Amino acid sequence: MIKNIIFDIGNVLTYYTWKKHIYSFGFTDEICDRVAKATVKSNEWNEFDRGVLEDEDIIDMLVKNDPGVEKEIRQVLAHMGGLVEKADYAIPWIRELQTKGYRVYYLSNFSYKTGRECKQALDFLPYMDGGILSCEEKLIKPQPEIYRRLLEKYDLSASECVFLDDTQVNVEAARAEGIAAIRFTTKEAALPELEKLGVK
């Protein structure tokens, strides 16, 4: 029986609006593409979420991916508030689930920097019953340890949890830990999947 709903944040309770953010600076399409490839599309971007290195050290790493757009990279990363926008349904959905008796948690790859600069988009977090951000644990999904850490921290039974994430590899990692998991695309698509698990 499912008692606990665990949400990813990016592209689940928020929209990851990196393209809109980069284009908001008025760069040409070519420059926007280069900045994206050097930053949000790069492997090094995950270091923000891992929370081990200092922000400036990570930014220096990203600049090395394409030094020709260093100025633009630094400009985009100096103001990251536009990277995330809250989904309108976030708080109502959380409250509805809690009213029905479910406990609601978050488990997300998220950076200190984004958390600081996107506070308004994350105003639903205080409504939740708890959760884990990758930067705080120095672990990132799909590492199995981060799922185990959430279960241990809140004394949750894996068989009583369902996890919603927009990335298939993270869904599969949750299932490997005995957690029911749904690949999230939209709330409308997720509701019948939750219902199949007995979540009303």
For each predicted feature, which ranges?
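A metal-dependent, Asp-based hydrolase signature
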Residues: 45-76
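Hydrophobic alpha-helical core bundles mediating ligand binding, dimerization, or RNAP-core interactions
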Residues: 22, 39, 58-63, 77-80, ...
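Short, surface-exposed acidic
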Residues: 27-38, 67-78, 199-200
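Generic structural signal for small/hydrophobic residues in well-ordered secondary structure
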Residues: 8-11, 51, 97, 106, ...
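Short, acidic loop-to-helix structural element flanking the phosphoryl-transfer center
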Residues: 56, 74-105, 116, 144
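Asp-based, Mg2+/Mn2+-dependent phosphohydrolase catalytic module
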Residues: 1-7, 111, 116-200
